[in-house]
Amino acid sequence: MRYMVIVEKGEDGFGAYVPDLPGCVAVGESRDEVLRLIREAVEFHLESMREEGAAAPDPSSSSEYVEIPAP
């Protein structure tokens, strides 16, 4: 499966979350670190769901950029 991950840069590092998996988040000092950690978080999240007998949700989120004219 392929889930969309949102990565945000903060003052002290990076944060990431998966819109299709509420509560699945990670933080790291670098973009590479947060991407590694969110992969681990997704695997753990899905494994926990399987253990509880829940089906993994189909990926359904998408993203788009909108362009607006500069003032």
Regions found by a protein language model. Give the residues of each.
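Short, charged, surface-exposed hinge/linker loops at domain edges
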Residues: 1-3, 36-71
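Short aromatic-glycine-(Arg/Gly/Cys) micro-motifs in beta-strand/loop hairpins
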Residues: 7-21
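Short, surface-exposed helix/turn micro-motifs that flank interaction/cofactor sites
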Residues: 17, 35-36
